């Protein structure tokens, strides 16, 4: 299950923030989290899954579909007939509608097209409120979403701080090439800001050599 939820808070998660986890869900379970999956039947239509047995479709569903650019025609489709990307979008809509205490996206970005990933990322950054945990080993994806980062290694927490501080730390993880470049440059007194945006990096380099 790529979207789960928890009704139990935990001291390592900052309330009402988006926390990235570089590790896996077992690390969180071993840290005291209880997770629940979303129950559904493959034979249900999307409308049945999101709207229950009500005849009239809830306006909140229509509004979220519009904001995420999801075709209303999907409401008539059965869950089993959705593509993987479409199903992830529908699960995300379900989570928005049901407002769980803590939502967990477990490698939600895996296999997700750039188009769908961008829609979800933009919605989370602009609209989502509440506590969200994003589990992934893609540091660029985590950086695009998260305020805080937790790094697990062998079941132990190696880092739990504001996201950008990971780049200044000595924690050994697989950094994206752009971060490796900035770290190398800063070791030679370049004083560049950490970013995963190539355009922002070029601007910073230009400012530093003026």
Where do the PLM segments sit?
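H-loop/switch region of ABC-family ATPase nucleotide-binding domains
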Residues: 135-137
């Amino acid at each position: 299950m790529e979207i789960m939820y928890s009704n139990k808070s935990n001291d390592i998660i900052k309330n009402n923030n988006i926390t990235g986890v570089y590790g896996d869900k077992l690390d969180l379970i071993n840290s005291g989290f209880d997770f629940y999956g979303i129950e559904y039947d493959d034979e249900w239509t999307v409308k049945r899954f999101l709207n229950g047995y009500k005849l009239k479709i809830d306006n909140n569903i229509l509004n979220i579909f519009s904001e995420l650019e999801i075709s209303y025609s999907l409401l008539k489709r059965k869950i089993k007939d959705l593509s993987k990307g479409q199903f992830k979008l529908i699960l995300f809509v379900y989570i928005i509608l049901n407002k769980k205490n803590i939502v967990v996206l477990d490698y939600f970005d895996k296999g997700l097209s750039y188009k769908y990933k961008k829609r979800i990322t933009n919605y989370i950054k602009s609209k989502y409120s509440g506590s969200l945990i994003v589990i992934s080993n893609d540091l660029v994806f985590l950086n695009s979403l998260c305020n805080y980062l937790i790094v697990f290694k062998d079941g132990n927490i190696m880092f739990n701080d504001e996201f950008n501080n990971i780049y200044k730390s000595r924690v050994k993880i697989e950094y994206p090439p752009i971060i490796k470049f900035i770290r190398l440059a800063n070791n030679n007194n370049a004083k560049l800001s950490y970013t995963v945006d190539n355009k922002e990096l070029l601007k910073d380099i230009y400012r530093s050599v003026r």
